[in-house]
């Protein structure tokens, strides 16, 4: 008798412990009816757009910093501690069972100055020839570098979060010890993640790349990137972060096209396949007397161009309202920190300043060497914010969740266990640093270290810039209009017109005739 048997195979067993679920901030944080406006002063910076100008006598002393329109500007805003606010109503929240946090509700990034295009370039750029419209088959010499300039890729971008944005770039990697690499071999490269700091260069059309480590000729990129690293925000990594602290939301707009097509000079590290065979799949060889007999270089590159800059495509100077963030953190500024990372090279005008250094004033005829030429670039910003005051309950589940997410949050709230009272008398020495006294058993508590102390940011203190009078500020009035808030309430008074007032009117009644 035949019988059916199920397919024998591996049986899926659930994990022994349930997978922890990450809570969204809206699940355990309660919003209040208190909203605050915060704004900055006009933030200005001036410098050289290509490189920092250093002192000749002291090379480590920077006289003029590097300020480029293609640099990342990373603002770190220090918010006031809401738990130390002197609120009018003492019963607003229970400090023994709750803590107050800030929630970002609106932001406007203001950019000052007119639109402009700033060019960059290199006086000794590795341009062997123009491959778009060649007029002959050129032969290489020892030095074919040319003075070339271009306009960078047009980029507008901002990233909002409570931790620094994460960037990516391709860098030189360590080769395998076996087989040992030879001098002149192409090194391996790897993708590297790092925080985006203030002053880091954004991609200008040549890629997110470590030019300083991987371009030994120092002539294959413009001056503003040849000695540094170009980074690009790792949106894939930040977007997949379950907490989403580094990326509440972002705005991005890129534009470029290839304007010119060049070829590099030098020895080709990767030769064409079968270059000297009788038959080749890639080309047919030339005769001995022809210039084409010696193959030219085949490292082709294009120069980028950002093209038209228009006010119709601006991401800045307009408000953004945060209703739902991309991660589980819906705009909560943990540790009273807010990071704004941005780059905008549509306001990229470089000022050329000429100063007369030599030559008589009377009957003077122009001579170029009598004038010194300088280059400066300026950046102008102004920002406004709308924050909502929220309450965090100090329950066991919430504190356990915060401890796994970021233990520093609980440390900053000074949530410590009360130690038991001493059971007996203890010894206390007077001169702890004396050689006659034994070393202390416990080191005194040191001040808490900043987790970003080694990173460079544009720090802006907003501790004294908060105001609850939203109607006195431009962004505050727009927020009140958008959300329907009037005097802190959603209720709107209904105005009754006097023309609709009720009037008493008398209606005459007729008597019915009685029938006889």
From Swiss-Prot:
Describe the protein's quaternary organization and the partners it interacts with: Self-assembles into homopentamers. The capsid has an icosahedral symmetry and consists of 72 capsomers, with each capsomer being a pentamer of L1. Interacts with the minor capsid protein L2; this interaction is necessary for viral genome encapsidation. Interacts with protein E2; this interaction enhances E2-dependent replication and transcription activation.
Indicate yes or no for the key word Disulfide bond.
yes
Function per UniProt: Forms an icosahedral capsid with a T=7 symmetry and a 50 nm diameter. The capsid is composed of 72 pentamers linked to each other by disulfide bonds and associated with L2 proteins. Binds to heparan sulfate proteoglycans on cell surface of basal layer keratinocytes to provide initial virion attachment. This binding mediates a conformational change in the virus capsid that facilitates efficient infection. The virion enters the host cell via endocytosis. During virus trafficking, L1 protein dissociates from the viral DNA and the genomic DNA is released to the host nucleus.
Task: List the coiled-coil residues.
Answer: none
Name of this protein: Major capsid protein L1
Q: Where is the composition biased (Basic residues)?
A: 507-516
- Polar residues bias (residue ranges): 497-506
Organism, scientific name: Human papillomavirus 4
- What gene is this protein a product of? L1
An MF annotation (GO) of this entry: structural molecule activity
What are the top taxonomic ranks of the organism? Viruses, Monodnaviria, Shotokuvirae, Cossaviricota, Papovaviricetes
Where is it predominantly found? Answer: virion
